UniProtKB/Swiss-Prot annotation:
One of its GO terms (molecular function) is calcium ion transmembrane transporter activity. The chain crosses the membrane at residues 32-52, 107-127, 152-172, 375-395, 421-441, 471-491, 512-532, 583-603, 641-661, 666-686. Belongs to the CSC1 (TC 1.A.17) family. GO terms for biological process: calcium ion transmembrane transport. This is Uncharacterized protein C354.08c. Acts as an osmosensitive calcium-permeable cation channel. One of its GO terms (cellular component) is cell tip. Residues 1-31, 128-151, 396-420, 492-511, 604-640, 687-865 are extracellular.
Length: 865
């Protein structure tokens, strides 16, 4: 019997790392093919599902622009309509987001054509001449710069200059387009008619000036061509938003109880619905659920009314608003005044864009939260390296996991086909799932740091996501295999020498830079799989299989409330930080591999083409902007594009340095100055014309007359001070049975025969002689589209009533002659939208309402996809 010494764990790992493994190269090849095949098949299936369901459920008469009823009728508007012409339909943020997607598409279509036709043949020829046994090499390695040395790399230097000039040239052209679009947005009727376009937000007002008279004195110190028309400093609202939220939760709870009880009005349950209420620490009793929630609704409603009536008895906040006659005067004043008397000055955002809780925070609190938030972000970056290491080392390359798991190593050898499928699907899926978690964490940190507006919070999320994606999920993710190899070698050396100090000596002889560059080049196969899977994800967004499945299950097996049904018909909210971060992430990956592995460019060009078409359809027919910042995302996006360009230059410089071409590496250095010079040019030539409205004698700015500005239009403050209270929604076929079970007040008129209140009714509301508001809103669940339209009209009418009441009017100081009471129009808009405007509160308290121009965008309410 012969006894053989068994290799130790460290020796097995060392052999697997240091020795070339032809099986692994074949395994990686099949993994890429499986990944591409799976992504292509799933994309085709999702596209077919979307095409079939769209023709069945779409409401064509309300689509703007209209679509044909054919299977592929949805593609024609995407080709025929220019993005620039959709400004008034989609908004500036949506247009600029699509322009950035189109910019990426143009860049990578041109780069893919250049690099694939020039660099790939050069790489193949150079690899065959460099390596005698090139036939045994990985086919993907032949397409890259991995084995290219000598004068062959001059082609990569030339291409580096080409893509730097190309990116900056196209970026300059798109920058000018964005500048013109933002100026068109500033001059649009929708923006001009909004109160916020003519107002300044004054933050951190000194204690001695926290009054309307003090704010008037502060306004007189501003460098402005004209005096302001109106100033208003806000009052503290204390616990009013919490009471309003409890009221809305009680309404939704009552709706859930009634929806379950009246699920089948022809066959009601024998017993009334009940719920358990705590009576003590350990005891509870059953009470009638309908009566319980009805009492809570009435109680919270009275508390909300009392809090609103006593609002102006509260102390003043440290922020206020100054309103001018025209938007140009407000922009010009904001341009020349950043601070005055210790207070900060900026353009007032839209009412729906405010984060009112953060607006009330003191300067010291915001500073402390910002500091703690940055510390937490740094800790998260470091902690996320562990997750990145596990995924990068073991999931993206199962042979690394097999080196420490003998059973898996045996399986990889015997069943390589099956495990290549697992690696091709699992690794990009796990990476995508971890990226989703990051976005949620970043948004919470940005909110806690004290962002004033939702758009600034989203820009903060974009900045943080870009840092952690580029650092952790791209650079460290790609180089983690090198760190793994270095750690194993140090452990092996320590065991062999019996001394950790001797083990660390291996670090001195370890070719860190060379192996890092080699790992970066070899990791291109993973990024090809990841880009292919991400392309498939865009078809998931447009087909919405998960959302439709969840809603189908809820509809068939549960009891959704009428409000749920109405909310499902509302357009979804488009999250720009998430979408733009993904595009920047893909741009950074693809541009870094432009000269290293041109095959990545081919897949990136397909990804951006698919993204442009799908996102254009979504923004035209499916989603709305949650808030409108007027294109404020463009400058952060450009900064990150320039950073990605510089990172690509650094990586190519290191590759050429490792390949022995020191002179060729030095030739890359001038490229670093191009992006810096471009940024300086943008700061002085383009940014001032983009951030503020500029005076143009050929474009007339709509300036409202003094007698066209009503007092109700001067309404600033937290939306909870004027938002209509929610009323319970019940299905219309339960109208006759409802009085038997519900003791609250109801209206007997048909909601589908909705009519606006007359002038006499409005006067009654002003005098306080209003009729009791209805406590129940009946909804025909068999005709949700019509019910949605009627309910929206009712909410708008109720909002106008609230704005006409005395406690919601601005009690600021008017710096012009007051109008007579008979001349005060009571139904002016207070938000950005013309004709029908709904503040952010309706969005937050009744999510089926969206702040859009209903006459132009109502098709989105009815469009299922």
């Amino acid at each position: 019997m012969v006894i053989e010494k068994r290799e130790s764990f460290i020796e097995v790992v060392i052999n697997s790392l240091l020795n070339d493994n032809p099986a692994q190269a074949k395994f990686d090849k099949y993994s890429i093919l499986v990944s591409l095949g799976f992504s292509s098949l799933l994309s085709v299936i999702l596209l077919c599902i979307f095409t079939l369901l769209r023709t069945k459920f779409n409401t064509y008469d309300r689509c703007i622009p209209p679509m044909k009823k054919s299977l592929w009728g949805w593609i024609e508007p995407l080709w025929s309509i220019k993005v620039e012409d959709c400004l008034y339909n989609m908004g500036a943020d949506a247009v600029i987001s699509l322009l950035f997607s189109r910019f990426c598409r143009d860049v990578f279509l041109i780069l893919a054509a250049i690099c694939c036709t020039i660099l790939i043949p050069i790489n193949i020829v150079a690899t065959n001449k460099t390596l005698a046994n090139s036939d045994s090499q990985n086919a993907y390695a032949k397409l890259s710069i991995q084995n290219v040395t000598g004068n062959w790399t001059w082609a990569h230097v030339v291409i580096c200059y080409v893509f730097n000039v190309l990116v900056l040239f196209l970026l300059a052209r798109y920058y000018q387009i964005v500048m013109r679009i933002r100026q068109r947005y500033y001059r649009s009727p929708t923006y001009q008619q909004s109160m916020s376009s003519r107002s300044l937000l004054i933050m951190d007002i000194p204690t001695t000036m926290r009054s309307n008279n003090g704010l008037s004195i502060l306004a007189s110190r501003l460098k402005s061509s004209e005096a302001p028309m109106h100033v208003h400093i806000c009052h503290a609202i204390k616990n009013l938003p919490k009471i309003l939220k409890k009221h809305d939760n009680a309404v939704r709870s009552l709706e859930a109880v009634l929806a379950k009880f009246f699920k089948n009005p022809k066959k009601l349950p024998d017993d009334r619905p009940v719920r358990r209420v705590k009576q003590g620490l350990l005891t509870s009793e059953k009470v009638d659920a309908i009566d319980y929630y009805s009492a809570k609704i009435e109680n919270y409603g009275l508390r909300v009314d009392a809090a609103r009536e006593s609002l102006y008895e509260n102390e003043f906040e440290h922020y206020g608003f100054i309103t001018y006659k025209s938007s140009y005067i407000a922009h010009d004043t904001a341009r020349h005044n950043s601070r005055v008397a210790g207070a900060s000055v900026s353009m007032a955002p839209e009412p729906s864009d405010f984060l009112w809780d953060n607006l009330s925070l003191a300067w010291s609190t915001r500073l402390f939260n910002r500091m703690i938030g940055n510390i937490l972000f740094i800790i998260l970056i470091i902690a996320w390296i562990i997750e990145t290491a596990l995924v990068a080392i073991f999931i993206s390359n199962l042979y690394h996991l097999g080196s420490v798991w003998p059973w898996l190593q045996q399986q990889l050898t015997s069943r390589s086909g099956f495990w290549s499928i697992v690696q091709g699907i699992l690794s990009p899926a796990v990476a995508g799932f971890t990226f989703m978690i990051l976005e949620i964490i970043m948004r919470r940190i940005s909110y806690w740091q004290g962002s004033f507006t939702k758009s600034s919070r989203e820009r903060g999320v974009l900045n943080k996501l870009h840092i952690i994606f580029t650092l952790d999920n791209f650079i460290i993710y790609t180089l983690m295999a090198v760190f793994w190899r270095l750690g194993v070698i140090i452990a092996y050396k320590t065991k062999e020498e019996g001394n950790f100090a001797e083990g660390m000596s291996a670090f001195a002889t370890f070719d860190t830079v060379g192996l890092s560059v080699s790992s970066f080049v070899q990791f291109s196969t993973f990024w090809i799989m990841f880009i292919a899977h991400s392309t498939c994800s865009f078809f998931v967004e447009i087909a919405q299989p998960i959302t439709l499945t969840i809603r189908l299950i809820k509809t068939k097996f549960f009891s959704p409330t009428p409000r749920d049904l109405l909310e499902w018909t509302a357009p979804t909210k488009y999250v720009y930080s998430q979408v733009l971060n993904k595009l920047i992430y893909f741009f950074t990956i693809a541009i870094c591999y432009a000269c290293i592995n041109p095959l990545v460019l081919l897949f990136a060009s397909v990804l951006f083409c698919v993204n442009y078409l799908t996102q254009k359809y979504i923004l035209m027919y499916v989603s709305n902007s949650s808030t409108e910042s007027g294109g404020g995302y463009w400058r952060p996006v450009v900064n990150r594009i320039l950073l990605g360009l510089e990172l690509a230059n650094i990586i190519l410089f290191l590759c050429l340095w490792v390949q022995g071409g020191r002179v060729r590496a030095y030739c890359i250095i001038p490229n670093f100055s191009f992006a810096i010079a471009f940024k300086i040019w943008c700061m002085f030539a383009l940014d001032p014309k983009s951030h503020y409205m500029i005076e143009d004698p050929y474009m007339k700015v709509v300036e409202p007359l003094e007698n066209e500005i009503s007092e109700s239009e001067m309404c600033f403050g937290h939306p909870s001070t004027y938002a209509p209270l929610l009323v319970p929604m019940v299905r219309s076929d339960a109208r006759a049975l409802l009085p038997l079970f519900y003791s609250g007040r109801t209206e007997t008129h048909n909601k589908f025969d909705f009519a606006t209140d007359s002038d006499d009714a409005s006067e009654k509301h002003l005098r306080g002689e209003e009729e009791p508001l209805e406590n129940v809103d009946f909804v025909d669940i068999d005709n949700v589209d019509t019910a949605k339209e009627v309910h929206d009209q009712q909410q708008v009418q109720q909002l106008k009533k609230n704005l006409s009441r005395s406690y919601t009017r601005s009690r600021g100081v008017s710096l012009r002659a007051r109008l007579n009471e008979e001349e005060l129009p009571l139904t002016e808009s207070i938000t950005q939208d013309s004709q029908i405007s709904i503040p952010e509160t309706l969005e937050s308290q009744s999510t089926e309402i969206t702040p859009i121009n209903v006459s132009e965008h109502y098709d989105k309410y009815y469009h299922i996809f």
